[in-house]
């Protein structure tokens, strides 16, 4: 892992396929060691700053537990816990934190923020989520896919992403396919397709590794033969409620439900979601949406699919911690 030491983790295309694979291998080993009580602490004495301009359950807990398991200490800086971008520039914040911490995680808005932190901090910077990319999520996703199709190469797997494909998840899936050769199908209305330049770049790379990237509006053709169907919330973090009706009308036909799962003709197809999910009305926001838009059976995914044996979403959630631990170990462990 020496070639990853001190390296930033900002987006997946910053890595070679071999480096990406090495992170997955390390994550699997760390997961096994933790479960077998054999984990060895290699980050003892390290200090890690966690900058969250957007709140999160999984990302924060994953970084904190991973750090604690490895003997590191963390400082959580929440949405109101720092002056970044308000009273102090990102450049200055980077140079201050870089003098105090061994690594910095950023979860927030524009990709340019995490890129600036990386440019000036002088220590490894990790992207916990930006508007453009969500690389740690895809690392966990592919680890989960490996676990459920053991012995199968990524270029033998078919992953369908149904919904709004122009967001950070769609972009990072394109990059993951570019590195691994997945058969990636983005199933979405054309208004929700990613930028053509990124699609072209990732398609060319995916083909080199035995894969392909397809964009389609056709549900039946898009899901046929799929090994995994993935979706995400239709309303992104921080979006105005006024956009809800427009987005729901646009994406209602791409809901992951029993019919879509059956159209794969694969009885072993699995369901993926990065969470949180609007699959029922058991949350305040879920109740509001169910009432306003008649979505009592779920929004982007039905409760039937979410709670089915095909759903492996909590394996994904757990693997966030193991893969994030691998990233910190590889970039901080000497």
Curated annotation (Swiss-Prot):
| Keywords recorded for this protein, A-Z | Amino-acid biosynthesis, Arginine biosynthesis, Cytoplasm, Metal-binding, Transferase, Zinc
Binding sites annotated in the UniProt record for L-ornithine: 168, 232, 236-237
Query: What SUPFAM superfamilies does the database record attribute to this sequence?
Result: Aspartate/ornithine carbamoyltransferase
* Broad class of the protein's primary localization: cytoplasm
What positions does the entry give for carbamoyl phosphate binding?
56-59, 83, 107, 134-137, 274-275, 320
- Record carries keyword NADP: no
GO-annotated biological processes: arginine biosynthetic process via ornithine; citrulline biosynthetic process; DNA damage response; L-arginine biosynthetic process
Q: What is its EC number?
A: 2.1.3.3
Signal as UniProt keyword: no
Pathway in which this enzyme or protein is active = Amino-acid biosynthesis; L-arginine biosynthesis; L-arginine from L-ornithine and carbamoyl phosphate: step 1/3
UniProt subcellular location: Cytoplasm
Q: Which reaction does it catalyse?
A: carbamoyl phosphate + L-ornithine = L-citrulline + phosphate + H(+)
Gene3D superfamilies attached to this UniProt entry? Aspartate/ornithine carbamoyltransferase
List the GO molecular function terms. Answer: amino acid binding; metal ion binding; ornithine carbamoyltransferase activity
Offer a single GO CC term for the protein. Answer: cytoplasm
Q: Which family is this protein grouped under? A: Belongs to the aspartate/ornithine carbamoyltransferase superfamily. OTCase family.
Query: What PANTHER family does the database record attribute to this sequence?
Result: ORNITHINE CARBAMOYLTRANSFERASE SUBUNIT F-RELATED, ORNITHINE CARBAMOYLTRANSFERASE, MITOCHONDRIAL
| NCBIfam families assigned | orni_carb_tr, PRK12562.1
What is known about what this protein does?
Reversibly catalyzes the transfer of the carbamoyl group from carbamoyl phosphate (CP) to the N(epsilon) atom of ornithine (ORN) to produce L-citrulline, which is a substrate for argininosuccinate synthetase, the enzyme involved in the final step in arginine biosynthesis.
Subunit relationships:
In E.coli strain K12, trimer of identical or non-identical chains are composed of ArgI (I) and/or ArgF (F). The trimer has the following composition: FFI, FFF, FII, III. E.coli strains B and W, which are known to contain only ArgI, produce only a trimer of identical chains (III).
**Stated name of the protein:** Ornithine carbamoyltransferase subunit F
């Amino acid at each position: 892992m020496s070639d990853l030491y001190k390296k930033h983790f900002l987006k997946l295309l910053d890595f070679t396929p071999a480096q990406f694979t090495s992170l997955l291998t390390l994550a699997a080993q760390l997961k096994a060691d933790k479960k077998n009580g054999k984990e060895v602490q290699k980050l003892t004495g390290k200090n890690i700053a966690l900058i969250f301009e957007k709140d999160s359950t999984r990302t924060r807990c994953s970084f904190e537990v991973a750090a604690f398991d490895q003997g590191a200490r963390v400082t959580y800086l929440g949405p109101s816990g720092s002056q970044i971008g308000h009273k102090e520039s990102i450049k200055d914040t980077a140079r201050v934190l870089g003098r105090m911490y061994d690594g910095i995680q950023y979860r927030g808005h524009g990709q340019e923020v995490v890129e600036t932190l990386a440019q000036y901090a002088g220590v490894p910077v990790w992207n916990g989520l930006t508007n453009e990319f969500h690389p740690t999520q895809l690392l966990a996703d592919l680890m989960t896919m490996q676990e459920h199709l053991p012995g199968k190469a990524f270029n033998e797997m078919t992953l369908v992403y149904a919904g709004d494909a122009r967001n950070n998840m769609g972009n990072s899936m394109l990059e993951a396919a570019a590195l691994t050769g997945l058969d990636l199908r983005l199933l979405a209305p054309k208004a929700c397709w990613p930028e053509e330049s990124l699609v072209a770049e990732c398609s060319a790379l995916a083909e080199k590794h035995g894969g392909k990237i397809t964009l389609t509006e056709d549900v039946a053709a898009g899901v046929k033969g799929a090994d995994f169907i993935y979706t995400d919330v239709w309303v992104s973090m921080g979006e105005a409620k006024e956009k809800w009706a427009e987005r729901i009308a646009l994406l209602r036909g791409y809901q992951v439900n029993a019919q879509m799962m059956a159209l794969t003709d694969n009885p072993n197809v699995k369901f993926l979601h990065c969470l949180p999910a609007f699959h029922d009305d058991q949350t305040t926001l879920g109740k509001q949406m169910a009432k306003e838009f008649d979505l009592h059976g779920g929004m982007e995914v039905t409760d039937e699919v979410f709670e089915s044996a095909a759903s492996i979403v909590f394996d994904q959630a757990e693997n966030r911690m193991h893969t994030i631990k691998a990233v910190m170990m590889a970039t901080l462990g000497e």
